Regions:
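Structural preference for solvent-exposed beta-strand-turn elements
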Residues: 3-245
Length: 245
């Protein structure tokens, strides 16, 4: 139930299957799989879409779920997952600090039996925000900030009110628009700490950045300077969000 800038999510479930039409609209729809699986013991979803960057496999997500005890059957474009005996916590080491795979493990492990220790986890601000939310609903999640996430499974979760952190990718996109048009733009409710990997890039191109609390004013020159080198890296490397390229 959506009201203006708020969304109310009720705890009723009408099924454990999400249609291909819905899954194809958004890459992050993949996160419904661990959420439904951990609650209902089974889930059927199709491969997610919604990303124009190119092929982005979900093998890390599925491998992690299998380690937690899920049985995953792939049939064409769909995946059917079951956990007959429930999910069980275990140590998991990601070969790459994938944001989606990290979130997948956190959601699945929240009500799994025992403790899950996720190593080489993503360090994006959204990981900390998800941990804050899960803890608010009764979970036991610890993010150490250095790539390790520890989740102690609980028997049940509860409702809560949570404010999502400002979207750093949207903010960076607006900043890019201001830069290429030689304009001036005031962004409100920005967490500049989350933008730390990209702010030096805008400054190197000649943009003037002024911060005032949660406000960020960017003023672009008539002609941008070329930056010497730009490489995408896992957060908090520079530049750490591939979407911004």
């Amino acid at each position: 139930l959506r009201r203006q800038r708020q969304m109310c999510i009720r705890d009723r479930m009408s099924g454990t299957c999400i249609s291909e039409e819905m899954m194809r609209t958004m890459r992050s729809s993949m996160l419904f799989l661990p959420a439904i699986l951990s609650r209902a013991g089974s889930a059927t979803v199709c491969y997610p879409g919604g990303c124009d960057i190119g092929l982005r496999p979900i093998d890390l997500h599925l491998s992690a779920l299998r380690l937690l005890g899920a049985r995953v059957t792939e049939d064409g474009c769909c995946m059917h997952c079951t956990a007959p005996g429930g999910l069980v916590g275990c140590p998991i080491h990601l070969p790459f600090p994938s944001v989606g795979a990290t979130e997948c493990v956190m959601l699945a492990a929240c009500t799994a039996k025992g403790v899950t220790t996720l190593m080489n986890a993503a360090r994006e601000p959204e990981i900390g925000d998800l941990a804050d939310f899960l803890n608010a609903v009764g979970g036991k999640v610890l993010v150490d900030g250095n790539g390790t996430v520890t989740v102690e499974g609980v028997s049940s979760l509860q409702g809560t009110a949570h404010t999502v952190i400002p979207d750093r990718i949207v903010a960076s996109t607006y900043m890019s628009a201001a830069a290429i048009t030689g304009g001036k733009l005031l962004l409100r409710q920005v967490r500049t700490a989350h933008l730390a990997p990209v702010l030096p890039v805008f400054q190197e191109m000649g943009c003037d950045l002024r911060r005032d609390g949660t406000d960020l004013l960017i003023t672009a020159p008539e002609r941008l300077r070329a930056f010497k080198r730009l490489t995408t890296m896992p957060y908090p490397g520079s530049v750490s969000y591939t979407h911004l390229r």
